[in-house]
Design a protein with these regions (language model features):
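Short beta-strand elements in bilobed, periplasmic/extracellular small-molecule ligand-binding domains
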Residues: 57-69, 159-162, 183-202
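Short, solvent-exposed amphipathic alpha-helices that sit
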Residues: 45-62, 140-144, 170-189, 204, ...
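Short, low-complexity disordered leader/linker segments with a strong preference
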Residues: 1-34, 58-59, 63, 106-112, ...
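Hydrophobic alpha-helical
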Residues: 91-113, 179, 198-260
Length: 324
């Protein structure tokens, strides 16, 4: 009798083991799902995104753990390994480098990944498994170029300075291409009198623009891939007593400082990128993937189910008060 009871108990325990899975993975879905968020590095915009993701996770009954890779690829790989070892249901990943997508996916195993902030190559994305949530970076550049073309509609030749983010970053590439494609499609003669990578940093952009001014070259406008670099250029112009109304300076992100600069007339234009919208959409997309569903019915999703686009918005002196 004791042997029979022990045998039945062992069968029951084995059945529970199979039901729960050896990795300890949670039940998935909205309630009690476990999601790990690995951010490349924290700044004001990314903090807004993470805060919104946490708020949406709380609202949907999802457990969210946030880890900061501090711009270190090895740290981020360890985050992904942790998610795999501890049975997380999904991963949100702002990659330190979009080029590491293959390695990140390999370490995640069968855990779905929602990439954000820096977009991997399309070949690394697949419907229902590995998708990207963000804003179409080329549109930000397009909006900047449209502002410049409207401002200088009476000029046939425009001298342009461009400050770019980190080399190889998807936002750097997309925004810069959007600017150039739109400017060059206008039929005007576009002279790129200075162009370099300032890596999102205002101090770097300031120093570079000071060097540009020493060359004696003339610029009609300065287009920056983010507000931080634009504000660095503003500072350089003020120290050189340059009339900012005669040379519009443009950024992206509509940060608090960027919007304040537009109100003062120091910056001319920026593009609002909704960190809160991206954070919410990333959680919603992750829940879809956990449930084995496509993200196609999320607002902004593409027909192939690989992307969820959160729209950019134009910001200038006429509407900047709406973004404070």
């Amino acid at each position: 009798m004791k042997k029979k009871l022990a045998y039945m108990l062992s069968i029951l325990v084995f059945g529970v083991f199979l039901a729960t899975g050896c990795g300890g993975k949670s039940t998935g879905g909205g309630n009690n799902a476990k999601i790990l968020l690995s951010i490349n590095a924290m700044d004001d915009f990314r903090q807004t995104l993470v805060d919104a993701a946490q708020q949406e996770a709380d609202a949907k009954g999802v457990q969210l753990e946030v880890l900061d890779a501090s711009d270190n690829i090895e740290n981020q790989v360890e985050h992904i390994k942790k998610a795999a070892q501890e049975g997380y249901d999904a991963i949100l990943c702002g990659p330190v480098s979009a080029d590491t997508a293959v390695e990140l996916k390999a370490n995640a195993g069968d855990i779905p990944i929602v990439f954000f902030n820096s977009c991997p190559d399309e070949k690394q994305l697949s419907e229902g498994e590995h998708i990207y949530v963000g804003s179409d970076e080329s549109v930000a550049g397009q909006y900047q170029a449209e502002y410049v073309l409207d401002k200088f509609s009476d000029k046939e030749e425009i001298n342009v300075v461009i400050f770019k983010g980190p080399k190889g970053h998807s936002a750097t590439n997309g925004r810069t291409k959007g600017v150039k494609k739109t400017l060059e499609a206008s039929g005007k003669k576009i002279n790129y009198v200075f162009e370099d990578y300032a890596d999102w940093d205002g101090d770097t952009a300031k120093k570079m623009f000071e060097l540009f001014l020493k060359t004696g070259s003339k610029a009609d406008c300065v287009i920056c891939n983010n507000d931080g670099m634009a504000l660095g250029v503003v500072e350089a112009c003020k120290e050189a007593n340059i009339d900012l109304s005669s040379m519009p300076i443009l950024g992206v992100d509509a940060t608090a400082d960027g919007c304040a600069a537009i109100e003062k007339g120091d910056m001319a234009f920026t593009v609002y990128q909704s960190g809160s919208g991206q954070g919410k959409a990333a959680i919603d997309a992750a829940i879809k993937l956990i449930n084995g569903q496509s993200v196609k019915d999320i607002d902004g999703a593409t027909d192939d189910g690989k992307y969820v686009w959160v729209p950019f918005e134009k910001v200038d002196s006429s509407n900047v008060s709406d973004y404070k």
